[in-house]
């Protein structure tokens, strides 16, 4: 147990992430995370087999549900994970994210950073990891080699009212910059004893003391591997489309425009075109590097190379 008074526990929800979840777990163990609390909401791709290995080793507590279309707040498994981390593992701090998201702490590991945190609630920016080509054939590199980070992402919003209009879905595909360089919402780390509830998306917590001021990290970040390969991307879009069909924005205010758009692209057989747009050409990479929209940062890749590959 660290000098924090208890372990750092990472809480995450998961569905169908077999290609990345072992790397995710090993990476964060290497950063000083000691325990995990996971909620699987219906994986069918081998993810559960991997999670069960870590459950048997004592590193992970696993809760299983079977319908990924049920809204998280209807079962409140988000907050339940925080309570589990506090009550079962006696967590000092909790990190909250998804298994395609990797924490990067400036200059140190998780316990070292959190020991000096100026607030019991810390908001980390989340940046997309930009896919790169492995060779001249245009094939996508293994995600473990990605070293381009959208550190100054573009801020724009999708007009999802276009979905029902003639040519609207095509416009959603082509009339915007690639989604991979768009701003995405942050993630949160919090001391376990201040958490009253967890906000959907793991973007913040409801603190027991409403006067707590959040510290906003500026050097560290959470790297998001949302587009790793075409099959993974299409399956994620299928799950999103299924969720949006059951939970349209009129019912679920947490259904983001990003998800509504992704569901529409999937339902109109445009998802592989959308994936191709996330792979920037060498000319686009050079231009975005000059603009400062993306930066080279191999910290995640270097740690993953030490792990030696996962699933």
Predicted regions and their residues:
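Ser/Thr-glycine-rich phosphate-binding loops at phosphate-binding pockets of nucleotides
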Residues: 12, 39-47
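N-proximal low-complexity "stem/linker" segments adjacent to membrane-targeting elements
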Residues: 1-26
């Amino acid at each position: 147990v660290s000098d924090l008074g208890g372990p750092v526990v990472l809480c995450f929800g998961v569905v169908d992430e077999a290609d990345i979840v072992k790397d995710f777990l090993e990476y964060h163990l290497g950063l000083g995370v000691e325990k995990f609390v996971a909620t699987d909401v219906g994986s069918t791709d081998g993810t559960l087999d991997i999670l069960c290995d870590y459950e048997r080793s004592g590193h992970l507590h696993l809760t299983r549900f079977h319908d990924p279309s049920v809204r998280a707040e209807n079962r409140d498994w988000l907050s339940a994970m925080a309570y589990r981390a506090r009550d079962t593992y006696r967590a000092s701090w909790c990190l909250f994210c998804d298994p395609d998201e990797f924490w990067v702490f400036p200059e140190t590991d998780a316990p070292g950073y959190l020991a000096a945190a100026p607030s019991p609630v810390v908001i980390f920016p989340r940046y997309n990891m930009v896919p790169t080509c492995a060779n001249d054939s245009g094939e996508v590199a293994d995600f473990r080699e990605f070293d381009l980070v959208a550190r100054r992402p573009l801020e724009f919003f999708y007009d999802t009212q276009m979905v029902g209009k003639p040519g609207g879905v095509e416009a959603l595909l082509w009339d915007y910059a690639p989604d991979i360089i768009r701003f995405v919402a942050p993630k949160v780390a919090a001391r376990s004893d201040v958490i009253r509830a967890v906000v959907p998306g793991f973007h913040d917590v409801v603190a027991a003391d409403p006067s707590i001021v959040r510290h906003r990290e500026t050097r560290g970040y959470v790297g998001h591997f949302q587009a790793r390969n075409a099959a993974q991307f299409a399956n994620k879009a299928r799950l999103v489309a299924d969720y949006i069909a059951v939970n349209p924005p009129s019912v679920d205010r947490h259904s983001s425009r990003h998800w509504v758009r992704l569901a529409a692209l999937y339902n109109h057989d445009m998802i592989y075109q959308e994936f191709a747009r996330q792979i920037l050409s060498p000319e686009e990479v050079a231009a975005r590097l000059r603009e400062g929209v993306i930066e080279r940062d191999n910290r995640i890749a270097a740690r993953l190379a030490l792990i030696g590959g996962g699933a």
